[in-house]
Amino acid sequence: MKNIISLISKLKRKDKNFNKYLRRNSTLSESEIVQLSYDFQSGEYIKRYNPELVRKNLTPVIDEINKTTNIKTLLDFGSGELTSFSYVLEKLFKSDIKFYACDISFNRLFLGSLLLEKKKLLNSSINLFCNDFDKLPFFDNSIDVIITNHSIEPNKSNAEKIILELYRVARKKLILQEPNYDIACESGKKRMMSNNYVVNLSQILKKNGFQFEIIKTKYNFNDLNPSSLYVIKKNTRVKKNCKFICTESMKNLSHVKNFYFSKETGIVYPILNNITIFNKKFFFFKKSI
């Protein structure tokens, strides 16, 4: 792993595409490649943060959230540096909602937490956690609404696993804002294939018998990567308590100061800078400070 980190540091200085290079020149799994790529890019989204562009991009998501009644819990999956999540908070902050945001990259969440502090958006209703790509520390049917914003996009091989996990945890609705290969131009389709993006979301949803609709969006950050909202309705009447659980035993955790632990497995989940760590392979790079 030291060799990989050294190599990516050199690639960064040469402004190379980490994800593409590692897919071609390493034996790392897709989830490891995605995590390392985002870890080393941490801070780039905050540097380019433009509130007006974020507003345009997320307005359809907010509109869809507001169509859902009696929301008590919301998860932003693959929240990165929390730039989009901060807008969601600003629009819904006065509501009685308990918010969760997660990402595979601790470094991105760490920088995002500083952004939320700067915006005075951090409080006890917000829970940040670093997760494994396809494991969420929640009971079935425990989160009312789950949203994504291009976070399934780079996980082509694992897209179905991720969607099934999101569906397991969701109670009312999934709102996935993800690339729509079917409406992309030829150049866009080639770009999606070259970048190893998910191109078959509709087929995955149909295969699993989900009730869903596709809503085209008017604005895209990149016209070569057009997105749509994939709105999956669940509306189960069963509701479990929304609290962190052990991702191995799927049972309750005990909370002691700055960590959670499982009595069944003995696994400890530390809390760093108000971010609970469920990802066993997380890294922290000094450059994030």
Predicted features, each with a name:
Residues K218-F244:
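Core SAM-dependent methyltransferase catalytic element
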Residues M192-F212:
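Short alpha-helix
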Residues R171-N180:
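Conserved beta-strand signature within the Rossmann-like core of class I S-adenosyl-L-methionine
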Residues I147:
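A conserved beta-strand element that flanks and buttresses the S-adenosyl-L-methionine
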Residues P154-E165:
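A short, conserved alpha-helix within the catalytic core of class I
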Residues L75, E81-F133:
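Class I SAM-dependent methyltransferase SAM/SAH-binding core
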Residues K135-D140:
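Short conserved loop adjoining the S-adenosyl-L-methionine
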